[in-house]
């Protein structure tokens, strides 16, 4: 969108320019204060070649971001909205659940406005885990607008997501230039911000933040200051801004971003990118190559995975139970811990049955008799 006019672009073209774009006049932009990223539902008319019209002009506007145009005029800018800690939990362990989503819900609960990062070495099942989380959120929370953003991914992964995930899939495959990666990511972020300004709950599942940062590093003008791994000192500012946009908004609306970060690839650049994003999220899910090598999935390192301020998402009862379970798992290796939890989850239907099933493991796992008695009483 320019100062004089704009275009409506379709998700079928990944919001890039095409011959099917719809022309929006300057008067309409000023009247309804339309911004970049607004989703508009309206009426178009056939272009008149005699007047030099090449695109379908927008004749009438019915809705902007699912709201009446008159109500959108007075909306607050995204920057002026007050961010809060996530306090409404995504129910990803109730209906249409998988073993992976139950484990995530236990150890790294997700809330509306979460800024989560899935740390994953190659071939540990990060894309599969992301797909399962997406399907569970879409099924249990139809009020949430779900966007799956695939950057620098394989074409077959894109097709798999489009066919098996109930959400909007926006992508730029690895054979596309870095400029396209950046454009697609920017328009998705702008769309999400505009929807949040109108009070909607939006979830972006990004695969991956590492490749997006690589794309920004390629297109950003050099500052003359190069970090280890060949990363420009200013190149990570924009991907940080993308990831940092996730927040829970006071008085309604939220933007949740769950992104994957790739590690242990042998690339120094990937390690530098991960270190830059390591402390920016408020939820971290760590995947372990040792677990994946033993063909145990989901390959989650339970002791290294957690959510900050989880007391806002869990009830006091569940919080106490989780504290005791973590104390039990602290004595185990990552492989033993996930195997222990997975075995018991497969035999139970809900949380209550799961908590009862681990009572039998208390005596053999807790050495101190005093600690054992206290934990048995609490569980």
Swiss-Prot record:
Belongs to the Rho family. Its EC number is 3.6.4.-. The keyword Repeat does not apply. PANTHER family: TRANSCRIPTION TERMINATION FACTOR RHO. GO terms for molecular function: ATP binding; ATP hydrolysis activity; ATP-dependent activity, acting on RNA; helicase activity; RNA binding. HAMAP family: Rho. GO terms for biological process: DNA-templated transcription termination. This is Transcription termination factor Rho. It is an enzyme of class 3 (hydrolase). Residues 1-68 form the Rho RNA-BD domain.
